[in-house]
């Protein structure tokens, strides 16, 4: 963590699951300050009390800023002195964004533009924008707005000399706020049916710790305008539900199929065919460089030696598919799940 020594990190949307995961990773390091920028004062107050109680010796490093990424002035007021930004503020519930698409535009599109504008004005060293697999071949409002977020980030990076801007794409982050596993646990404990949308639907899965790892990899190894993804495994929704049943004593026969919700796909894509054509294989990650040609399309060719991706498209149907045993082990290893099994209260539950 030496690269963050004495630095100030801002996390937009910082009261969410990702912000909590970053805090737990960074608080006991040599980082100077972590700024939590969000619009919900109740969540900030809850977080303040939780961290003062559980991390009394280092909680002073957390500074809270009430504001909304939709307001450029709001973002600007919190920006001076910031060295790095993890931009996690977003509307991410697919059905909600289908019914209120302009709200998704205001947060995911205009909000991102505001954060990047203020960051460039203040010579912030690096901004990592958190995106989603739904931004690749998007069919729903959430995915479309996150795709535009990525386009804004890449466009801003072309003229950004002092601020590095990268995007990271995630699949489903297990046990994050608003995700399905906590809902299933609640349904099992209350004796209600375990609801899933479509048994054969596949999704990439990753832990919150892996989500933080991806952002740190982008921070350390990404170039201006890059999009980076992890080589995540996938499983069917049916397998995931059965794994949660196995861990919490649910019954397979209690699983109830309720049908695909508004805007959902049968499978998700982390890298499109077009992106795979230029993606660099970096071990556990892929890096998609920005196309930095100008509108004159001046053609030039350079000889490179990077290892290109050898797949035509990276999606949750053609990636490694976890079986029930593997899925159960991956879910069971999560800190959130261990806490739930052992009766320990989770932060930002």
Say what each PLM segment does:
Residues 30-43:
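Conserved glycine-rich Rossmann-like NAD(P)H-binding loop of the short-chain dehydrogenase/reductase
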């Amino acid at each position: 963590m030496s690269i963050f020594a004495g630095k100030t990190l801002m996390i937009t949307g910082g009261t969410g699951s990702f912000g909590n995961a970053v805090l737990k990773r960074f608080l006991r390091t040599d980082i100077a300050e972590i700024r939590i920028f969000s619009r919900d004062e109740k969540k900030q107050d809850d977080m303040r009390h939780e961290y003062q109680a559980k991390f009394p010796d280092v909680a002073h490093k957390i500074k809270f800023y009430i504001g909304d990424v939709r307001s450029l002035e709001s973002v600007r007021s919190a920006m001076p002195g910031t060295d790095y930004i993890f931009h996690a503020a977003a509307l991410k519930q697919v059905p909600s964004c289908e019914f209120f698409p302009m709200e998704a535009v205001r947060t995911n599109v205009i909000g991102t533009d505001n954060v990047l504008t203020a960051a460039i004005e203040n010579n912030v060293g690096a901004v990592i924008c958190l995106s989603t697999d739904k931004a690749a071949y998007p069919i729903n409002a959430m995915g479309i707005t996150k795709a535009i977020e990525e386009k804004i980030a890449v466009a801003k990076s072309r003229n950004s000399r002092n601020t590095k801007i990268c995007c990271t794409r995630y699949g489903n982050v297990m046990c994050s706020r608003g995700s399905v596993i906590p809902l299933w646990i609640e349904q099992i404990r209350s004796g209600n049916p375990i609801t899933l949308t479509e048994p054969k639907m596949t999704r990439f899965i990753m832990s919150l710790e892996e989500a933080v790892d991806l952002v740190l990899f982008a921070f350390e190894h990404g170039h201006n305008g890059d999009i980076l993804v992890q080589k995540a495994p996938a499983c069917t929704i049916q397998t995931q539900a059965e794994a949660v049943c196995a861990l919490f004593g649910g019954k397979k026969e209690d699983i109830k199929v309720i049908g695909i919700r508004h805007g959902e796909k049968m499978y998700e894509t982390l890298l499109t065919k077009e992106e795979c054509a230029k993606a660099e294989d970096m071990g556990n990650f892929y890096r998609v460089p920005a196309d930095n040609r100008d509108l004159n399309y001046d053609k030039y060719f350079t000889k490179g030696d990077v290892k290109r991706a050898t797949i035509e498209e990276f999606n949750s149907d053609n990636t490694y598919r976890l079986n029930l045993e593997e899925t159960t082990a991956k879910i069971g290893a999560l800190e959130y799940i261990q806490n739930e099994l052992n009766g320990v209260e989770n932060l930002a539950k």
